[in-house]
């Protein structure tokens, strides 16, 4: 459809479509994706779709692929995984933190990156990532914003695996989306180092501080005004 109308296509994929290096090395944009090496259906579908877009770009379609990390920020009306996790903490659940973390990026910065990618030559792949933040760091930022005491107890991720079946059952019974799953724990256990320098160089992508993103997300979840 885009090719027929001479339109520009920017496919929003995910860093979950990437194969992480075995060593602690920077992760950069690939020339192609390898869905067969990924463990989750979500990652495989994103990788396969990205390959289709890149193949179409070789055939003349003006298209690019962007790879956001874990998107956080105000305006999440549907309450994704990260918003559910933050909202649970704001309600006092859980009273403890867990080890692990992830690379978080602000939704407003991702939107600006997508708009900038619309103006670039086709066939490009861009990492739209922020920086790594531990779960405890995010919870501490929430505590400081709300004036609550910081959590003192941090549990290892390994202790959560035995309770996953009960969490899943509770979610099914209450028809609620639960923030914990085996795939979520695996992501939190990894420590990827994404290199978004190409997006900075070619798109002017400059992600804002994680602390600002967490504060603005909390303000949105609490019904307070948020700066754009």
Regions found by a protein language model. Give the residues of each.
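A conserved pocket-lining segment of Rossmann-fold NAD(P)-dependent short-chain dehydrogenase/reductase
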Residues: 33-37, 84-105, 109
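Substrate-positioning beta->alpha
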Residues: 48, 79-81, 98-118, 124
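A hydrophobic C-terminal alpha-helical subdomain
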Residues: 94-98, 104-109, 157-202
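Mid/C-terminal beta-alpha module of Rossmann-like enzyme folds, strongest
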Residues: 113-178, 196, 210, 214-228
């Amino acid at each position: 459809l885009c090719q027929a109308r001479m339109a520009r296509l920017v496919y929003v994929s995910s860093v979950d479509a990437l194969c992480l290096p075995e060593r602690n090395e920077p992760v950069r944009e690939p020339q192609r994706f390898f869905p067969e090496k990924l463990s989750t259906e979500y990652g495989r579908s994103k990788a396969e779709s990205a390959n289709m877009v890149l193949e179409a770009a070789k055939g003349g379609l003006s298209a690019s692929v962007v790879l956001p990390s874990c998107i956080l920020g105000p305006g999440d009306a549907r309450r994704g995984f990260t918003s559910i996790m933050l909202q649970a903490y704001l309600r006092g659940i859980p009273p403890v933190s867990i080890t692990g973390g992830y690379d978080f990026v602000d939704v407003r910065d991702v939107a600006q990156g997508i708009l900038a990618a619309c103006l670039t030559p086709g066939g490009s792949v861009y990492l739209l990532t922020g920086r790594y933040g531990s779960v405890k760091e995010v919870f501490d930022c929430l505590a400081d914003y709300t004036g609550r005491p910081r959590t003192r107890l941090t549990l290892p991720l390994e202790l959560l695996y035995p309770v996953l079946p009960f969490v899943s059952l509770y979610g099914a019974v209450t028809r609620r989306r639960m923030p914990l799953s085996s795939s979520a724990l695996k992501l939190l256990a990894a420590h990827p180092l994404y290199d978004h320098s190409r997006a900075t160089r070619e798109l002017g992508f400059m992600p804002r501080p994680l602390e600002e993103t967490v504060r603005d997300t909390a303000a949105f979840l609490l019904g307070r005004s948020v700066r754009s």
